[in-house]
């Protein structure tokens, strides 16, 4: 099963990261000044002596998608022998969860003799300050108390909401790659894969990527999928150049109508593809497409196995398992022996799960506010309120109808809100 080329050809060393020399010098100077790092690494890369760099508590790498922000930190950790603790800040949003994951990672010993640890908060601009239950404040608190390097990435960290984060961090801007730099990387990959790629074809891919190297590599892998060993300009024209906007309805239709396995698998290379959203939509659309119980059963079996891989990935951070999950979820669901002939038009409905979450959003927000209020006034954690106190209050309310009124008066909370909570 093919590993995504963005992972296969991810730079293994600091020097291998394409361009971004200024960012490398700043990052290395900060690491060498404030933490331990190999002497030869510091001699080569620690070129900056600015007070702003040396005094920074954390580093925030800023730049458009695909310029190497995350890759730079992976290469840095490998180069200096540090264990990387990586979190996507837009996935782990709450203060409690952030502290739990980071704390566990810092407490646990390493099995591989790393010289230290470095924490990476990826995509911090994915946090929604109001909705995400103290996530931003938690990151700031972790930075202020941390004794290990904290690095963050963001596409656009200059939103006013992230001012507190910028105030305690050194913002390092990574520039968009030139067309020539992207072509050079694509050329090396073609050589490594034993593929004969026309120069104009590579330039076409690079031009449409707009400096996003990750997108360009994904496109190249898509064009050369299925064991193809040649790439011409005509191939690009026939398949079509990058389309950055593909709705979930179009993604589903392409998956179900794919004529062969690699065609379905290649959907994951599209920049619009979101595998978490895909799993939600696929779960509810399989019965719409496959009417026969046997076919439906096979599709669900493969999707559930893919979901098991995703669960393990989230628990262990073994992202090398992702290709296996995507092959099952895309090619596995698409290519079924008893697959029927599909009609010209399939009406895909919007997932009920997402509709329910959207409708209940306000109720859930009110519930969270009430839980927070109870936690502060009773001097317990929010998880304790949810797991213990709400249950006990619910039992008491069933045996004594007046307890809700007494709670309302004692805590100064609307009785209707308390009933909603229970």
From Swiss-Prot:
Domain of life of the organism in this record? Archaea
Residues holding ATP:
63-70
Instruction: Give yes or no: UniProt keyword Glycoprotein.
Output: no
What intrachain disulfides are recorded?
A: none
Gene3D superfamilies with a match to the protein in the record: 1.10.8.60, P-loop containing nucleotide triphosphate hydrolases (3.40.50.300)
Give GO terms: molecular function aspect only.
ATP binding; ATP hydrolysis activity; DNA clamp loader activity
Q: Which UniProt keywords apply?
A: ATP-binding, DNA replication, Nucleotide-binding
Q: Name one GO biological process term.
A: DNA replication
Task: Write out the coiled-coil annotation as residue ranges.
Answer: none
SMART domains assigned? AAA (SM00382)
User: Which proteins does it associate with, and in what oligomeric form?
Assistant: Heteromultimer composed of small subunits (RfcS) and large subunits (RfcL).
Q: What does this protein do?
A: Part of the RFC clamp loader complex which loads the PCNA sliding clamp onto DNA.
The name under which this protein is listed is: Replication factor C large subunit
Q: Which organism is it from?
A: Pyrobaculum arsenaticum (strain DSM 13514 / JCM 11321 / PZ6)
Query: Which classification does the entry list for the species?
Result: Archaea, Thermoproteota, Thermoprotei, Thermoproteales, Thermoproteaceae
């Amino acid at each position: 099963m093919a590993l995504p080329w963005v992972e296969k050809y991810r730079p293994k060393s600091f020097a291998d990261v394409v361009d971004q020399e200024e960012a490398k010098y700043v990052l290395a100077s900060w690491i060498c000044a404030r933490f331990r790092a190999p002497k030869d690494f510091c001699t080569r890369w620690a070129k900056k002596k600015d007070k702003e760099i040396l005094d920074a508590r954390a580093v925030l790498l800023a730049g458009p998608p695909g310029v190497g922000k995350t890759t730079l930190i992976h290469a840095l950790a490998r180069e200096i022998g540090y264990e990387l603790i990586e979190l996507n800040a837009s996935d782990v949003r709450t203060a409690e969860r952030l502290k739990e994951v980071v704390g566990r990672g810092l407490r646990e010993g390493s099995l591989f003799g790393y010289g230290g640890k470095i924490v990476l908060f990826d995509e911090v601009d994915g946090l929604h300050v109001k909705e995400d239950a103290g996530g931003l404040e938690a990151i700031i608190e972790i930075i202020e108390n941390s004794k290990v390097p904290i690095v963050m990435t963001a596409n656009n960290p200059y939103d006013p909401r992230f001012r507190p984060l910028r105030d305690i961090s050194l913002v390092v801007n990574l520039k968009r790659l030139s067309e020539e730099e992207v072509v050079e990387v694509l050329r090396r990959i073609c050589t490594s894969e034993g593929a004969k790629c026309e120069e104009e074809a590579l330039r076409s891919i690079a031009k449409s990527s707009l400096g996003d190297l990750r997108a360009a590599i994904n496109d190249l892998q898509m064009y050369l999928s299925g064991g193809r060993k040649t790439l011409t300009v005509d191939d690009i024209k026939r398949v079509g150049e990058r389309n950055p906007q593909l709705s979930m309805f179009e993604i589903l239709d392409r998956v179900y109508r794919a004529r062969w396995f690699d065609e379905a698998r290649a959907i994951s290379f599209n920049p619009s593809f979101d595998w978490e959203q895909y799993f939600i939509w696929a779960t509810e659309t399989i019965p719409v497409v496959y009417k026969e119980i046997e076919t439906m059963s096979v599709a669900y079996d493969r999707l559930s196995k893919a979901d098991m891989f995703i669960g393990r990935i989230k628990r262990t951070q073994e992202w090398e398992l992702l290709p296996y999950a995507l092959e099952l979820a895309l090619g596995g669901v698409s290519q079924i022996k008893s697959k029927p002939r599909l009609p010209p038009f399939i009406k895909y409905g919007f997932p009920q799960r997402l509709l329910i979450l959207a409708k209940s959003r306000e109720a859930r927000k009110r519930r969270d506010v009430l839980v927070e209020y109870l936690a502060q006034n009773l001097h317990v954690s929010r998880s304790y309120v949810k797991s213990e106190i709400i249950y006990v209050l619910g039992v008491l309310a069933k045996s004594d109808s007046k307890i809700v009124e007494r709670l309302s008066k004692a805590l100064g909370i609307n009785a209707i809100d308390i009933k909603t909570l229970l």
